[in-house]
């Protein structure tokens, strides 16, 4: 389309080409965009830590097999250590970002959530930071170290059955009684954007990352990270790392990507990665669908092996969920993806791989059991 627009000095009619219509915004832009994540970063800056990035040459050596050495290809790993975040895991970011957007009346009434792990402790700590009450619904079977953390941070614990309907019903009852605001663990815009600040920091710390590997469960963390990473460096590949569970049944994120639709009817995986048992939600799935390039599944043995490597080589303690990213990086699936996937395989001979170590809250008794000689 051409629009007329006045006359030139010579008297000839001057024309201006109409601007191209703007592309419609993605359905996820309203709750998971780079702009919103940058706003979240400014909001939580006085409260959350900028976590360090560590490297380990001995693990890099383990990543290169004989074929890689012949071809001259190398992989360098960069570990984003959310184990050093307040509360010992990444969840504090999303919890703090959520609380900081509440009204005065909402702050006075407090917050409520249901969680078996790090989100519960993170919300209790964020609430304590702002001096407001927190009500935490915890299903049976939650790790004792995480229960202890909730109590230390002043959270008021209510136990329930380990089913989603019972968790939600218990939360609803507390909301009715107290007027508290529900802060969901992952399927919530402020939580997604808070977790997305991990990706923002990571790309500032290592601007030329070729790939980022992130553990996935409900999808709050990887949705935020993918939105940030793809917004800054579109060619950077984002890979989800998901536990298969002891039953070796396909996990829901893997199946959802495979079928290109949200799969939410699979059984909860029986896995030592207790923080990765949730299913993706209606907000997180569209981001995973559009911005996550692949899903790599890992076994229980691979998770334990990754924990041992991190402990022995890096001298860091991570919980099973926190080691899932490295387990994926060390897997044969990742080697195949590296060799066969053109967008990632053609980047360079020297490939920079980011791995998010998402948490370090693990019972020492479990650690001793996992590391005991078989």
Locate each region found by the language model.
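PLP-dependent amino-acid enzyme catalytic core
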Residues: 2-374
């Amino acid at each position: 389309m051409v629009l007329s627009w006045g006359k030139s000095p010579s008297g000839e009619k001057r024309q201006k080409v109409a601007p191209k219509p703007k592309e419609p915004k993605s359905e996820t832009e309203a709750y998971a965009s780079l702009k919103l994540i940058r706003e979240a970063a400014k909001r939580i800056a006085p409260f959350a830590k900028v976590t360090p990035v560590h490297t380990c040459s001995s693990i890099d050596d383990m990543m290169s097999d004989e074929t890689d050495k012949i071809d001259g290809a190398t992989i360098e790993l960069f570990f984003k250590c959310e184990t050093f975040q307040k509360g010992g895991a990444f969840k504090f970011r999303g919890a703090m970002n959520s609380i900081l957007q509440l009204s005065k009346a909402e702050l006075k009434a407090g917050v409520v959530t249901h969680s078996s792990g790090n989100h519960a402790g993170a919300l209790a700590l964020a609430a304590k930071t702002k001096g407001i009450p927190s009500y935490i619904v915890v299903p049976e079977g939650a790790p004792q170290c995480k229960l202890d953390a909730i109590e230390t941070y002043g959270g008021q614990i209510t136990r329930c059955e380990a089913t989603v309907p019972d968790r939600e019903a218990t939360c609803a009852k507390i909301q009715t009684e107290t007027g508290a605001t529900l802060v969901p663990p992952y399927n919530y815009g402020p939580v997604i954007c808070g977790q997305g600040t991990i990706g923002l920091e990571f790309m500032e710390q290592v601007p030329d990352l070729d790939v980022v590997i992130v553990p996935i469960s409900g999808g709050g963390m990887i949705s935020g990270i993918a939105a940030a990473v793809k917004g800054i460096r579109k060619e950077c590949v984002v890979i989800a790392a998901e536990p298969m569970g002891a039953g070796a049944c396909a996990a829901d994120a893997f199946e959802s990507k495979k079928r290109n639709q949200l799969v939410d009817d699979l059984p909860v995986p029986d896995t030592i990665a207790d923080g990765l048992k949730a299913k993706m939600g209606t907000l997180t799935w569209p981001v995973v669908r559009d911005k996550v390039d692949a899903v790599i599944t890992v076994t229980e043995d691979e998770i334990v092996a990754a924990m041992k490597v991190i402990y022995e080589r890096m001298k860091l303690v991570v919980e099973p969920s926190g080691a899932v990213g490295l387990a994926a990086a060390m897997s044969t699936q990742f080697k195949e993806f590296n060799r066969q996937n053109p967008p990632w395989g053609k980047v360079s001979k020297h490939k920079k791989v980011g791995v998010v170590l998402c948490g370090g809250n693990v019972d020492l008794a479990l650690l001793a059991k996992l590391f005991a000689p078989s």
